[in-house]
C-alpha cells in the first residue's frame, strides 16, 4: 500500500566496494552470527595482519574453520549481533555493526558492500513480528547469547537494494542527495 513500516540509517559500500543494486527475498535471520571472512578481505586485510602479528586471529576473535577464517559471535563481531540473509550471488546481506558512530555521518559509505543497519533490533522485531516465538525478550536474548541461531522466515520478504540521488517524500517534495559514488 506504499506505507513505510520501517526506516533506519544505513552504512553502504565504499567506492572501491560499492553496494550493488539488486533484489532478493529475505529468508533467514541469524542471531549472534559468525562472520565468514570473504576471500578478498582475507587476502587484502587478514593475511597481511597475520604476517605482521601471529596473534592477529586471536586478537580479533577469529579462527580457522573448515579451511577459511571466521570471526566468532560476540560484542566486536563485524556483523554485530544479527544479520538478515536474502540469498544472492553478490553475497550481500543486511547486518548490525559494532561501529555505531558511522550512522550519524551525512555520508556513510564505509562497508565492503553489505548494508549495515543502524536499527538492527527494530528490524528484527519487524521481520519476526508475526512469529509468536520471537518476542522482544527472546530477540534480545538471541542477539546477546553469543551462540549462533538461524531462524527461517515462514514468509520470505522481498528486499530491493536501490540507489537514488533524488527521492519524493511523503509531502510530495523532491529531496536531492549527494552521489556518494
Segments and roles (model prediction):
Residues 1-181:
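Well-ordered beta-sheet/strand-loop patches within structured domains
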